[in-house]
UniProtKB/Swiss-Prot annotation:
Organism: Yersinia pestis (strain Pestoides F)
Signal peptide feature range: none
Family designation: Belongs to the Smg family.
Protein name in UniProt: Protein Smg
Top-level taxon of origin: Bacteria
Length: 157
């Protein structure tokens, strides 16, 4: 499912954000590209829930939390998000790429993936997808895009 999400993001969302979505056409295009229908449907459902979260239609608790509150991860969240991923989320909060509401959307969408454990690169993609359509997060999206596609051209001395 995650490969489908990245393909969708790179092909449709990121390159053509104003495009009207014809879910049947996208499903057919993805099937023609070699993705399994189950993965396609799971990815489209994942994106639909993300859109609902971004519009505030689901999980209204996201908007009532104290921004200064410390996030305590559940056991299951710790299993999925190793120390490096949790540290990266904290880093994103500290540099103000993520606010508490976006952080909770990221964690919600991570937990909805069908992967037992998420690596740092996958987390970066999820953060980018979450930030993509949240009004007011345009600068955060650009910062995250730079972090995702950052290439270290420096030399070690």
């Amino acid at each position: 499912m995650f490969d489908v999400l990245i393909y969708l993001f790179e092909t449709y969302m990121h390159n053509e954000p104003e495009m009207l979505v014809d879910q049947d056409k996208i499903t057919d295009d993805l099937a023609d590209a070699g993705f399994y229908r189950e993965d396609i449907n799971n990815a489209l459902n994942w994106l639909e829930v993300l859109a609902d979260l971004q519009e505030g239609q689901k999980a209204p608790y996201l908007y009532t939390a104290d921004p200064q509150a410390l996030r305590i991860y559940t056991v299951e969240e710790c299993r999925r998000l190793g120390a490096a991923c949790r540290g990266f989320i904290l880093f994103l909060e500290q540099i103000q790429v993520l606010q508490f509401d976006a952080r909770e959307m990221v964690i919600d969408r991570i937990m909805a993936l069908d992967s037992p454990e998420i690596d740092l690169e996958d987390l970066k993609w999820v953060v980018l997808m979450v930030l993509f359509n949240i009004p007011g997060y345009e600068n955060a999206y650009k910062q995250m895009e730079e972090l995702l596609f950052e290439v270290n051209d420096g030399y070690l001395h």
